[in-house]
């Protein structure tokens, strides 16, 4: 674990959820560039009632919020906002590890900030749709003239960032690069200047689904989900408990409800906007169904056991590509099934999930496959299922 040295002190940060033999750092130079910028311009948080209020967007592991908290008289001078449950949980866990107050002010998307900020620092999100939506959100919730600083690593920055800032904020420019990171600056216009296309609508089966900004499959249902829809359980017993794990817009769980009206489906996602998309879609088309919605790290925090868990695992975690998220969700599913229950998984053929699944389940069978995807049915968790691989 590499110490994070910032203008007001030092933090020991870990990525969350914790995993053994972690090789990825919990901060980068874009975080440090934002903090250095505030310090160089005399915008560090100070003591007293006149300390500036700072709004932080898209803090990845708590590096920004916690560094500012070390400079602040109170954690209440800092408010964080973002779409990711795991990012918010990372900030809390790292706060505890560093002896800081974990009770940071937090506002989820679609909500207004709890306090009027004097300055904003923002990590540029991976999703262009989420970037557009957040820039418009800032234009509608900030007083005119509030300084806004954005940063990201050069290799991840969208080329259209400055034009998007100018469209939604009315101004914006790129600053100097530093250690493969780049800073951008703007001022809040004090009013909404342009509309976004979000939430958008996507046609799936006989439904027209709400899809909020940043949620996977913005324009149309992805090909993996379309293949999975043809291989879902259709004869579940009355009251069967089903989890749509990593539900996105909710289409998989909704298809289960269509075929099994008496099923009880729990929609799970770590994205607040994904879960809001699913909630909106289920309430529109299945208002009488017994449905539940869980914002969290997969199934963590749920005591319920399921007859069937459905999973189309992501192999991107932000800018990181790998199977570590899938492994964690497989581990959770293996301990969350009732006796005789099943995990049904779809994955890209080249990812070789069957090898990992065979270490967690005594029975792993192929239900369907095509040139690109495989659908597996997994039953009978192995004795080692309670010992995570990661």
Curated annotation (Swiss-Prot):
Function comment: Specifically methylates the guanine in position 1835 (m2G1835) of 23S rRNA.
UniProt keyword list: Cytoplasm, Methyltransferase, rRNA processing, S-adenosyl-L-methionine, Transferase
GO molecular function: 23S rRNA (guanine(1835)-N(2))-methyltransferase activity; nucleic acid binding
UniProt record similarity statement: Belongs to the methyltransferase superfamily. RlmG family.
Subcellular location: Cytoplasm
Documented EC number(s): 2.1.1.174
CDD domains: AdoMet_MTases (cd02440)
Organism: Alcanivorax borkumensis (strain ATCC 700651 / DSM 11573 / NCIMB 13689 / SK2)
Pfam families referenced in this protein's UniProt entry, alphabetically: MTS (PF05175)
Major place of residence: cytoplasm
Reactions catalysed according to its record: guanosine(1835) in 23S rRNA + S-adenosyl-L-methionine = N(2)-methylguanosine(1835) in 23S rRNA + S-adenosyl-L-homocysteine + H(+)
Disulfide linkage: none
Superkingdom of origin organism: Bacteria
GO (cellular component) term, any one: cytoplasm
Class of enzymatic activity (EC top level): transferase
Protein name, entry field: Ribosomal RNA large subunit methyltransferase G
């Amino acid at each position: 674990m590499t110490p994070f040295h910032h203008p007001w002190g030092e933090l020991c940060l870990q990525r969350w959820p914790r995993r053994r033999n972690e090789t990825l750092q919990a901060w980068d130079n874009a975080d440090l560039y934002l903090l250095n910028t505030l310090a160089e311009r005399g915008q560090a948080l100070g003591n007293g009632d006149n300390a500036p209020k700072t709004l932080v967007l898209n803090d990845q592991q708590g590096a920004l919020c916690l560094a500012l908290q070390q400079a602040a008289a109170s954690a209440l001078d800092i408010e964080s906002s973002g779409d990711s449950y795991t990012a918010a949980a990372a900030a809390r866990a790292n706060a505890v590890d560093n002896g800081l107050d974990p009770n940071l002010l937090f506002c989820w998307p679609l909500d207004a900030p709890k306090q009027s900020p004097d300055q904003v620092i923002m990590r540029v999100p991976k999703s262009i749709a989420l970037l557009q939506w957040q820039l418009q959100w800032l234009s509608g919730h900030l007083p005119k003239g509030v300084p806004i600083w954005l940063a990201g690593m050069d290799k991840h920055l969208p080329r259209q960032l400055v034009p998007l800032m100018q469209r939604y904020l009315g101004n914006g420019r790129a600053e100097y690069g530093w250690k493969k990171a780049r800073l951008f600056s703007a001022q809040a216009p004090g009013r909404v200047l342009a509309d976004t296309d979000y939430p958008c609508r996507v046609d799936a089966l006989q439904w027209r689904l709400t899809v909020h900004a940043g949620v996977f499959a913005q324009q149309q249902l992805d090909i993996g989900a379309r293949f999975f829809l043809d291989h879902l359980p259709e004869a579940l017993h009355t009251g069967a408990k089903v989890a749509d794990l990593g539900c996105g817009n909710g289409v998989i769980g909704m298809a289960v409800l269509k075929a099994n009206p008496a099923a009880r489906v729990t929609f799970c996602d770590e994205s607040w906007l994904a879960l809001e998309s699913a909630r909106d879609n289920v309430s529109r088309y299945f208002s009488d169904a017994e449905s539940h919605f869980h914002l969290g790290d997969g199934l963590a925090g749920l005591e319920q056991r399921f007859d069937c868990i459905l999973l189309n695992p992501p192999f991107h975690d932000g800018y990181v590509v790998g199977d570590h998220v899938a492994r964690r969700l497989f581990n959770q599913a293996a301990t969350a099934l009732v006796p005789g229950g099943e995990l049904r998984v779809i994955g890209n053929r080249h990812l070789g999930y069957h090898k990992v699944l065979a270490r967690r389940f005594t029975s792993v069978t192929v239900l369907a496959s095509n040139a690109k995807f495989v659908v597996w049915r997994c039953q009978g968790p192995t004795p080692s299922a309670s010992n995570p691989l990661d």
